[in-house]
Regions:
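Intrinsically disordered, low-complexity, charged/polar segments
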Residues: 2, 53-76
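Short, hydrophobic/aromatic-rich segments at coil-to-beta transitions
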Residues: 19-20, 44
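Hydrophobic beta-strand signal
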Residues: 23-24
Length: 76
């Protein structure tokens, strides 16, 4: 993991994408069971459990949130 990716992961965790947190994404409520998984600078995934079905899924962090996190890194 590069330094930039590590910083992005930390920023996303501060935004709530961390193990044990719940969030509504794509119209569904998920509970995260992993830390952010950075594939590329713009593709970030997180393992999560769908609260409605209990099914485990790998969910993509929405691009606007990733972009906002990257902008926050560039401003700092």
């Amino acid at each position: 993991m590069t330094r930039k990716q590590a910083a992005l992961s930390t920023r996303l965790k501060r935004l709530g994408f961390t193990q044990g947190n719940q969030m509504r994404l794509y119209g569904e409520i998920f509970e995260f069971v992993s830390e952010p998984i950075i594939i590329t600078d713009n593709v970030v995934l997180v393992d999560a459990t769908d609260k409605k079905t209990g099914q485990m899924r790998r969910v993509r962090v929405p691009l606007p949130i990733v972009s906002m996190a990257i902008q926050g890194l560039n401003a700092a």
